[in-house]
A protein has these predicted regions:
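Charged, low-complexity interaction regions
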Residues: 17-20, 460
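Short amphipathic alpha-helical coiled-coil/interface segments
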Residues: 26, 368, 474-478
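Globular "head" domains of long coiled-coil molecular machines
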Residues: 30, 34-269, 287-293
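Short, flexible helix-adjacent loops and helix caps
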Residues: 61, 206-209, 356-357, 456-463
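Pre-Walker A adenine-sensing motif
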Residues: 22-31
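C-terminal end of P-loop GTPase domains and the immediately downstream helical coupling element
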Residues: 204-207, 213, 219-397
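Charged, amphipathic alpha-helical linker segments immediately N-terminal to NTP-binding catalytic cores
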Residues: 1-18
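N-terminal J-domain/J-like co-chaperone modules of DnaJ/Hsp40 proteins
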Residues: 395-488
């Protein structure tokens, strides 16, 4: 257990001694603390959201058998047996019939459902839960309202009726629109726990037939977007959704590899002709019958091409035919590597996951503090507990993140945002202070003392309440750094 979790558990233990009612509250909050972080996947209609969710889970679950279920927020969580419940707006939970791993039908009208809770015994979601949403600017206004109600407005509702997300994966296919960026900010996240995904990377730019590899082009564009959106997202990762879904859901078979390999000798012009003409125009091949796939007729060739494009897209058709000669395993490995999902998953469970967990911890602190304003609980004792938590070095990053969120809302252009972000994101003394990795402990102490003086001078200026509070936490963080560096 990490130091933050230990500190929060100790605080909850103490909270539970105040009264039987607060003991129950502490146990409920502790359950939230122990659960894996929840990551919401958001994006516009046809942004590739469903294919990404399927790839991350490793099963085609985002596109359910019940069409109306795609218009409801769905939480995918690790657990057995495979089951689902509809959580209604009134807090009631109704079981949902699962057939062949898919939601067969909803037990209530969509407008009465808050969200669907789905448990799956799938190791791929053991480290984090996923929240799939109807999306932004969908075909109906109601769909976007459902997403907002559950993820934003729902925080003020009872816990049985709301979904608390700890981080967001934000999909877009070129450049995000202002309303999309605003929605992410409305979720209450910072750039540290918001991850951008440039979807459909395998068709970026000029596409599969362009002079430039679309995946390379997409990666360069993703780097540009990451710099432009640095105040909103941690980074931007290019993902080829169809390659991701196909390779991670076990769809590719040996037969698929064989029929794809039958096109290995065809030129790109052959394949274009087959797709465009229905195959008849290249019957007999273009220079020796290479496109025939061992004598297959034009119609059969077109069916093969369509099957391949349906599995791994045009990029896969044009780039992986020779790979297919080595069998389904090699083809699947190629698609996995090209998809971008391994890089995405690694980030989700490491650095990004750490920030999601810190966000969760901040939400727990705020929830403990909110208990003080209930008439049935001892206000002074709870507020004293929160005050003690603020001075706990193990929780300094949690309070820095809470301050970052508050400052972002009141003054997004203040220098404090850069200082707060650096202190939160840095793993070493040097990183937290913006120093080179080779900086000595003397350099660390000297720089921290200079920044401590700067923070003190800033606190003498006329600032917003959020900035005043942030400077107090920043000064505490610099003092902690000085103390720990001197002890090295």
């Amino acid at each position: 257990m990490d130091l933050t979790s230990i500190a929060l558990n100790q605080a909850l233990d103490y909270l539970g001694t105040f009264s039987p009612a607060l003991y129950d509250e502490a146990q409920r909050i502790r359950h939230t603390l122990d659960a894996p972080p929840r990551i919401v996947v958001v994006g516009r209609l046809k942004s590739g959201k469903s294919t990404l969710v399927n790839a991350l889970i490793g099963a085609p679950v985002a596109e359910t058998a019940a069409l109306e279920a795609t218009n409801v927020v769905t939480v995918f969580q690790y657990g057995a047996p495979d089951r689902a419940e509809a959580v209604l707006l009134n807090g009631e939970r109704l079981p949902i019939t699962i057939q062949r791993g898919e939601v067969a039908a909803l037990p209530a009208p969509v407008e009465e459902i808050s969200f669907i809770h789905r448990w799956m015994p799938t190791a791929s979601i053991k480290d984090f839960s996923l929240i799939d949403t109807p999306g932004l600017a969908t075909l109906t206004v109601e769909n976007e309202q459902r997403t907002r109600r559950i993820l934003i407005d729902g925080y003020e509702q009872t816990k049985a009726m709301s979904v608390d997300a700890d981080a967001a994966v934000f999909l877009f296919d070129a450049t995000p629109r202002m309303d999309e960026v605003k929605f992410i900010k409305d979720l209450g996240f910072t750039s540290l726990n918001t991850l951008g995904v440039l979807s459909r990377a395998d068709s970026f730019g000029e596409g599969a037939l362009g002079e430039r590899d679309p995946l390379d082009h997409a990666r360069q564009h993703a780097d540009t977007l990451a710099a432009q959106l640095s105040s909103s997202v941690l980074t931007v990762i290019p993902v080829a959704g169809l390659l991701a879904e196909t390779s991670h859901t076990g769809v590719i078979t040996e037969n698929d590899a064989r029929v794809m390999a039958s096109l290995a000798e065809a030129t790109e012009f052959d394949l274009i002709d087959i797709i465009a003409s229905g195959g008849d125009a290249v019957e007999g091949g273009n220079g020796g019958g290479g496109a025939n796939g061992g004598g297959a007729g034009g119609t059969q060739q077109q069916e093969i091409c369509r099957r391949v494009v349906g599995l791994i897209g045009e990029y896969g058709l044009f780039r992986a035919r020779n790979v297919a000669r080595r069998g389904a395993s090699e083809l699947n490995e190629w698609a996995t590597t090209k998809s971008g999902v391994p890089e995405l998953r690694q980030l989700l469970v490491t650095r990004f996951g750490k920030f999601a967990t810190t966000h969760r911890a901040g939400r727990i602190v705020k929830e403990i503090e909110s208990l003080a304003f209930s008439r049935q609980h001892p206000k002074d004792q709870i507020l004293n507990l929160v005050s003690t938590m603020r001075t706990d070095p193990r929780l300094i990053t949690v309070f820095l993140l809470l301050d970052l969120k508050a400052v972002q809302d009141t003054n997004p252009n203040t220098q404090l945002i850069q200082e707060l972000t650096r202190l939160i994101a840095g793993d070493t003394f040097q990183e937290k202070l913006g120093l080179p990795v080779t900086a000595s402990m003397w350099d660390v102490v000297n720089t921290a003392q200079q920044k401590l003086l700067w923070a003190h001078m800033e606190s003498l200026s006329a600032l917003t309440p959020a900035e005043d509070a942030a400077l107090v936490t920043i000064q505490r963080a610099y003092n902690d750094l000085i103390r720990m560096a001197q002890g090295q």
